[in-house]
Amino acid sequence: MKNRARRVIFSICTYTLLLLGLVGQIIIGGSNLQGETLKKEKTEASFQDIWSGEWQSNFENYLTDRLKIREWLIPIRNQIMYSLFKTSPNGNIIIGKNGNLYEEEYICFETQIYPPMTEDEINILVEKLTVLDKSLKDKEKKLFIFITPSKAEIYSEDIPVRYLKIAPDEKLPSTYNLFIEALNQTDIAYYDSTQDVRNLKQTSEFHVFPRTGTHWSKVTAAICAQELSDSMEKQLGIELPECKVKYQKCKEPLHPDSDIYNLLNLLEKPDEIFYEPIIEITDTCKEDYTILARGGSFMGSSLNRLIQNDYFARSYYMENTFAVCPEGVYSGNFDTYDSLPIQEMIEDSDIIFLEVNEEAISRMSFGFIDYLLENDILELP
């Protein structure tokens, strides 16, 4: 009787799961999964692949990826890993102390698991910037550098202990400190938002970097955008609009405040209080300057906010591998700088703006500086 009861229970569970899978396959809509959930593409069969078993394996993955119940099972599995075992289901996202999430790369640079740049390497970079600055000044143009902070530096106290154990005990001078020291020996105009963010962390009611994001919060970015504008006015001798930044709580996170939390594909909503900036333009007086900006994702919620509020007459905006230019020039993804009319963009611009995160100084501007110097782009008519 016991064996029969077990078989009945097993059969009921099996058929229930099959029924749920069938119902899920019918009623579940498009995928809402994010991050590492790319589906396998169907591959053509060849005799060699069939003989080796590779085609069968690929076809099995192809069918598995298209089971719509997968969209239920992945968040359930991920939530169990995250809540019960405090384990990240995404290998690139690290769960720190106090539930603070990090991208591993930022931790490795901050702890010097990845060694910092040497003083000679920094000097070579700053020498290139000095040459660029002089060349632009000769053409009556202006160079401005914008330095943005790393979450792993601002919230270093929440880095997991296991990274501190494998980091070197004796720290070398950091890339960031060497870079600032070298810049201070030049006449290059720059705004370092890192110290302002450190100070804001001590006084604000919100997290300057949300626990759920890898970037600074929308409010932090707006406050630093205001400081950036003031710094550009003072150092470049130009006039830009003035604004005041306030903030209020919001029910849902604004991008990018939960960007890496979303990549975990969990069932629960993030346990974080989110805020949204309220920006009031108090003075619209400005001079008609055209800006060419090159940088990474931290630029998207800071400088781009100034651009969207018409701080500049025109803008050529290059963030990572995406460019937004005036109508008729170019907008979209680009693989190389040769895809863009860089010479014409430089010629039309008054300000060349370079953003760099303190973690990314070693790859500053994604080769843009070298491209300008090595291709005689600054030899304008």
PLM regions: where:
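Extracellular glycan-modifying ectodomains
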Residues: 1-381
